[in-house]
């Protein structure tokens, strides 16, 4: 199986993605100019990003959010199950989002977690911050671990 990994695209969809079975996008997907604008982010994800995903030379795209993906943090806090199903349907089931979740593709176990340790002088400024001392993450044994930190 051929797996490709990228991160920190910040809205730049003019990337040459090689042919692969699975593309893993490890955070900071949204354009920096729109990162805190929820309506603009929603529109971008549902139109530009989904169309880009459908055009990629791969069978599956797995996304974990990054510290600039505020829209995904909001969806996670408010309606994660609905959002994942909605995006999967929009992309003809090509797109999979992971937040502390496993996903199996052709017997390969992927696990994704987006959390970052708070930056001491900027606490609560970024999406998906988590104090690992107070709230540690239990990562299962997996074949491919996707993180942003």
Region locations from a protein language model:
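Extreme N-terminal starter segment of soluble prokaryotic enzymes
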Residues: 1-4
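Active-site-proximal loop/helix segment associated with metal-binding centers of metalloenzymes
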Residues: 20, 33-37, 75-76, 85, ...
């Amino acid at each position: 199986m051929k797996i490709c990994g990228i991160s920190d695209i910040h809205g730049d969809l003019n990337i040459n993605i090689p042919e692969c079975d699975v593309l893993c996008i490890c955070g900071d997907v949204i354009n920096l100019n729109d990162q805190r604008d929820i309506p603009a982010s929603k529109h971008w994800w549902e139109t530009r990003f989904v169309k880009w995903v459908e055009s990629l030379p791969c069978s599956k795209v797995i996304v974990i959010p990054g510290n600039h993906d505020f829209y995904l943090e909001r969806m996670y806090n408010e309606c994660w199950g609905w959002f994942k199903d909605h995006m999967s349907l929009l992309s003809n089931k090509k797109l999979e989002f992971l937040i502390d979740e496993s996903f199996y593709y052709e017997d390969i176990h992927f696990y994704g977690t987006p959390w970052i340790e708070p930056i001491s002088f900027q606490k609560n400024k970024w999406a998906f911050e988590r104090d690992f001392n107070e709230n540690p993450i239990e990562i299962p044994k997996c074949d491919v671990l996707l993180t942003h930190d």
